[in-house]
Amino acid sequence: MLSKYQPSAHIAVTRAHWEDLHQAISSGKVTIDGNSLTLADVVAVSKFGCYARLSENRETIDAINESVSTLQECLDEGHHIYGVNTGFGGSADSRTDHLASLQRALLQLLQSGILTKADIGSGDTPSQSHAMPPEWVKAIMVVRSNSVARGHSAVSIGSIEAILRLLQRDITPVVPLRGTISASGDLMPLAYIVGAIEGNPGVFARAGKSPHGQALPAQQVLEQLGIPRITLGPKEALGLVNGTAASAALSSLVLYEAHRLALLSQVTTALTVEALRGSAESFHPFISQARPHDGQMEAASNILTVMRGSRLAMGTSEVQTGLVQDRYSLRTASQWIGPQLEDLLLADRQITVELNSTTDNPLIDSVSRHFYCGGNFQATSVTSAMEKTRLALQMLGKLMFAQCSEMIDPSLNNGLPTNLVADDPSLSFTMKGVDISMAAYMSELAYLANPVSSHVQTAEMHNQAVNSLAFVSARYTMQAVDIVSMMSACSLYVACQALDLRVLQLNFFRELHPIVCNGTHDAFHTILAPKELERITQQLVTAIQDAWLTTSRMDAGDRCQRVIKLSLPILLNEMRGAIPSDRQQVDLLTSIGNWEEATCYKMLEAYKQTHERFCRTQNTVEYLGAGSKAIYHAIRHKVGVPFHQGFVEQPSADDLDTTAIINGREKKTTGGWISLIYEALRDDSLTGVILEAVQPVRSI
């Protein structure tokens, strides 16, 4: 089955998943029929508690029942069927008539994972859990139920409904985190889920929402809740454990978040372009049309959409000083992001197909009444999807790291304060720690990007000489999702601060012209003609603004003095050409000295007043592109992360009631604010805003 979202742009796929998720959440249920399970359905059941139920469609029910009856007919005719009356794997040369015991023997060999007392809640909290998170287990349960509902596995309706009943009653088996090589599927994790539905007292489960509460033996949990135990039929243990459900389920959770992070990387790129007053020209359609890769064209278009109407990003016709073109982290962002979008789309197709596939062995064709021994359990397609996704995340993280560093570094950020401090940099280092954290995140992310598939080891009597390691790859890719989410939170925090400081700077520049104009008039109106005063004033304003951009490492008072001194050559040069000879007796040095002192004082006062007003009320949104405005507003108001005012923000045990708050809000550490953004990203509450910023619904 091909994904219903293909072919399409990446943002269309991301939006479709998000809309499907919220539709499922709104309806409160997901129907399992073996053919239509989506990434969004898996997320809805595992993360949002949607009710999963087996379809009552006649075709689905008949296919399941026919596979069971076909198996029984073949057994009655004396056929030898792999895993039903033979041994398993490299031991398939053995035969037995003890069919029920054989299925129990399979579970015995597979329930070999490590779980400590702490993992089941009867010991001290472990420093590192050996059990899967509950949402992973729930995802596995819904994916496996969907796969065997296709009617190729001889798994009965009763067994499928037993798994779904655990989900419906919010019962989560405790499943070991490690131990599967995703060769004959994810045998070991699935064996613990099967153990739970048969009431194995050696398998543990939790009822309710607490992931760290004490788990009880599955037998006890089922008895307490009045849930009947399942007695497995001739192929049911094999049919339930022999499949790629664990890998496909975790990959679904990974991809849902990876799509969002890829979209967010385009948003943070646009925010960075605006904050650094970069050029929108880098994303002009002509450039993409000259090299028409689908991903590049989409990324460039999306970035431009976010910046539409921006008063900060430079257009193609504007006169620019400094670099004539942006550095690579901005100028080539669409070329960098584009291939990652293409890879994620392919990964999405692979996982969507896997969700709606039969992945056990042997497979039953109820029409021909034939059993086929094959290898659909080899989860290499899932590995392929996860390796691509993890590398894409590394590439996106690297771009965010480069852009973030550029915004923080005063040598690269086009005149923003060093470390993006809002106060004096001699005693405030706002984003320096964030810069260091980003380097730490990036280093770990780069390590995780290494392939897992190249580390395959031979297993199980050389029968499993090649194995996919799909679940291991998915685990590491989920770690990459976590790290890139942290980096994204940092990037959003840094970008919003940089945008605020840029607008604060522009507010201050607006105050400069009257200060310089009045100061020049007061000092030199008896010496220069009005037209000469106007010309010199404009040149001084330009020189002062340029000097302001190059002195961002200095405290405000020293900075104003330095800026004025740097502008003096302009004044002296213009004076020399403008003063007639009969005025040479005038004490120009005194006039210039008075101008220097007065202008410096008024400039500093204007900066302090502008800064004070801005700390109370930010007018940043007036300058932002429409998409950037939506993101900025979400961070500042929906998430509640404010403009960082500097050293005064640091919480202290010595704070009085009056100093423990700023502008009516509490103080937090820098990491405390970033953590709020991180949580909003992970709980999906910002996805709608991100989608709207990149592709407003009205424009679809």
From Swiss-Prot:
Catalytic activity: L-phenylalanine = (E)-cinnamate + NH4(+)
Main EC class the enzyme belongs to: lyase
InterPro entries: Aromatic_Lyase, Fumarase/histidase_N, L-Aspartase-like, Phe/His_NH3-lyase_AS, Phe_NH3-lyase, Phe_NH3-lyase_shielding_dom_sf
Binding site for (E)-cinnamate: N242, Q325, R331, N361, K432, E460, N463
GO molecular function per UniProt: phenylalanine ammonia-lyase activity
Any one cellular-component term (Gene Ontology): cytoplasm
The name this protein goes by in its record: Phenylalanine ammonia-lyase hkm12
